[in-house]
């Protein structure tokens, strides 16, 4: 999602002040490259610039906001995830205090906006509502009238995030469920009736090759409701895979 948003902003005339998003296995290399990008961005800011930051930005967020304000620039923060809500790496007051350094917040939806306001966020807040999904691939998916409906579920697979999948087969009779993702810790899930596991496939390959009718957005432990911290977070989050399913 962050890479897509970076490309969309550039297409709208924005300038990347730092370094383009790259991925390295070495944490040391990644740390120094991120630091170089942040220093570069800070030096290039001019008065009246609007700096868009994709949040969370780990340890550098507050520092960048302060540098931007020292240079008389405005900061717009696009929220991807709230660490205090899902991963619990921050307390809620800590996160609200951190976000108070920005001038404007783009929340994912009205529920996230309301949650931020109810917990003391006083910044102006707008909403994104749904992610754009960039891909040059053409979907080939078509439903065959003679076959059962096919549903796909994409994402990291583990008992903490999607235990509900273990209980799903007993309710499946009119459709098949295809699982895509890495970290399959749901042992034996692919041996259950009406379920197939296809491992990790890059999103562009999935769009070009998958044959399915619907995509499932659901997290948690229960089939009756999205429960647990992951399931509860869906009330406030717009999963990027929703846009992926639409793109397929």
Language model segments and positions:
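A short, glycine/small-residue-rich beta-strand->loop->alpha-helix junction that serves as a flexible
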Residues: 1, 27, 53, 159-161
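N-terminal subdomain of nucleotide-sugar transferases
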Residues: 1-23, 167-176
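Active-site regions of enzymes building and remodeling cell-envelope glycoconjugates
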Residues: 27-34, 69, 73, 102, ...
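Extended catalytic core of nucleotide-activated donor transferases of GT-like folds
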Residues: 28-115
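Histidine-centered beta-alpha loop that forms part of the nucleotide-sugar donor binding/catalytic region
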Residues: 55-56, 79-83, 128-132, 180-182, ...
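Donor nucleotide-sugar binding/catalytic pocket of nucleotide-sugar-dependent glycosyltransferases
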Residues: 103-117, 121-139
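Conserved catalytic-core segment of nucleotide-activated headgroup transferases in glycan assembly
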Residues: 134-208
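Nucleotide-sugar-dependent
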Residues: 210-247
